[in-house]
Amino acid sequence: MPKTASRRREITQLLGKVDINFEDDIHMSIANDLFEAYGIPKLDSAEECINTAFPSLDQGVDTFRVEYLRAEILSKFDGHPLGIDTEAAAWEKFLAAEEGCRQTNERLSLVKYHDNSILSWGERVIHTARRKILKLIGESVPFGDVALRCRFSGGATTSVNRLHGHPSWKHACPQDVTKRAFKYLQAFKRACGDVVDLRVNEVRTSNKAVTVPKNSKTDRCIAIEPGWNMFFQLGVGAVLRDRLRLWKIDLNDQSTNQRLARDGSLLNHLATIDLSAASDSISLKLVELLMPPEWYDLLTDLRSDEGILPDGRVVTYEKISSMGNGYTFELESLIFAAIARSVCELLEIDQSTVSVYGDDIIIDTRAAAPLMDVFEYVGFTPNRKKTFCDGPFRESCGKHWFQGVDVTPFYIRRPIRCLADMILVLNSIYRWGTVDGIWDPRALTVYEKYLKLLPRNWRRNRIPDGYGDGALVGLATTNPFVIVKNYSRLYPVLVEVQRDVKRSEEGSYLYALLRDRETRYSPFLRDADRTGFDEAPLATSLRRKTGRYKVAWIQDSAFIRPPYLITGIPEVKLAS
């Protein structure tokens, strides 16, 4: 056996103890120990974890940062014993959003807008936004571009469950389609000729409305779309995403919003606006008013007119689409950007300050209040808790800033039941409690307390930050288990055990064929956009997680270069 392989096997055995358990309420103990170390009150109940008030902005950065962590750390925990029927709460919000869209459709259908000054202002913004959208995307739909960008997602459809959600299975199995979308499938089939076999399972009128876990207070409602509808929806979404780049809005990159939020917290010239249930509040009439007729017809043809609830009830949608639709994210980004830019134009404010990522909106502070008036007029509800127009705090796209300082909290989202869960939490404490690897001594005491609960060898095994949470993040140069081979470092990490699930070779071929077509012909697709593609599309099996963990090895991509050619390559020895 080669020396490297022998050493890897030896280390794998040393780190083999991964089945350990923790107390049920250890998440609360970790949080309260942190608060005690920083001298702030502990959390006494599950209700307090999710209902802690936003901290005062009239204090220093360090104090705010800790109090903000207290308000957020367990706010998204999914195991609080609150006795709330989270599914019922989700459906209540879903039906409320539908009622809101119905009222918006009626309001926007009125002919006389001039009776009220706000409505007159709203009408001006809508007409300006319509003109901007027309100029951006054109009057006619570029069906050729849409066809080149159509693809299946990796999720469930009305005919295929999540387990078989990979595109290769969807190409191999007949998929559902709605009656109005069927003509696009026929046209696509004629364009492909005999190269692909596009089969239909059922022609239907509805999608499936379901809930997925969100937090301890409520679930989240989404829709599972017919497979072929999703195929074309994603093509439309990709084209809209391309067009938005002409406004310097890149939906593949959150860093622009994050950077602008930092600048806004420092200079107070930009506001961050967040909307509640944004994707469930895009009414049909609003889309009809804003989009060119041909685009509107396409969007309505590809949507599902109805949704089937788990209890069998059928709901006729008042909104254009919901979470789960393939073009929802791009469409809402387009609408919010157009409205925001229109408000700026009418107020004679620089439109370049507008940046949008979904329902995360950044705009000049002077335009924030008029923009929120328009949003309320067209049926959206600003989330006042996450909207910041004045003061030293801003938040956007997962980054939180106070006077230009990163105060982003970390979250404990689920119970800590295994070694992998504890490593994730300890790494979160490390990232929150260090600056360039230098510890805040208050956070270090808590980190070291819970570090002792890990097996000894896992305490010593460290990997560089940026390589996931399969091991503790830290000073990797002292890791006794690292293996240096061909000027690269190999690190042992925890990975979830996976099993192979066979898939159709025919479906794999079609997936590879259409995927390569997209990467070859799209003029907008950059190298960074290709990272989400399956690297082995023709493999005859896929990996499925099992909930168990084992030791695997990752390779450090950093090339170890000798400092001088004369001295040669430095020798790196492993600790015994």
UniProtKB/Swiss-Prot annotation:
Magnesium is among the record's keywords: yes
GO molecular function per UniProt: metal ion binding; nucleotide binding; RNA binding; RNA-directed RNA polymerase activity
CDD domains attached to this UniProt entry: ps-ssRNAv_Leviviridae_RdRp
Residues that bind Mg(2+) 1: D274, D359, D360
Keywords: Magnesium, Metal-binding, Nucleotide-binding, Nucleotidyltransferase, RNA-binding, RNA-directed RNA polymerase, Transferase, Viral RNA replication
Top-level division of the source organism's lineage: Viruses
Residues reported in the UniProt entry to bind Mg(2+) 2: D274, D359, D360
GO BP of this protein: viral RNA genome replication
Cofactors required: Mg(2+)
Catalytic function, reaction form: RNA(n) + a ribonucleoside 5'-triphosphate = RNA(n+1) + diphosphate
PROSITE patterns documented for this protein: RDRP_PHAGE (PS50522)
Protein EC: 2.7.7.48
Cofactor mode of binding and number, as noted: Binds 2 Mg(2+) per subunit, Ca(2+) is used in crystallization to prevent RNA polymerase activity.
SUPFAM superfamilies, per the entry: DNA/RNA polymerases
Keyword RNA-binding: yes
Location of the RdRp catalytic domain: 259-391
Quaternary structure and partners: Homodimer; the replicase complex can dimerize. Part of the viral RNA-dependent RNA polymerase complex, the other subunits are the host ribosomal protein S1, EF-Tu and EF-Ts. S1 is needed for the initiation of genomic RNA (+)-strand replication.
Function, as annotated: This is the catalytic subunit of the viral RNA-dependent RNA polymerase complex. This complex is involved in viral RNA replication that produces (+)-stranded genomes via a complementary, (-)-stranded intermediate. Binds RNA cooperatively with the host ribosomal protein S1.
Protein's recorded name: RNA-directed RNA polymerase subunit beta
Organism of origin: Enterobacteria phage SP (Bacteriophage SP)
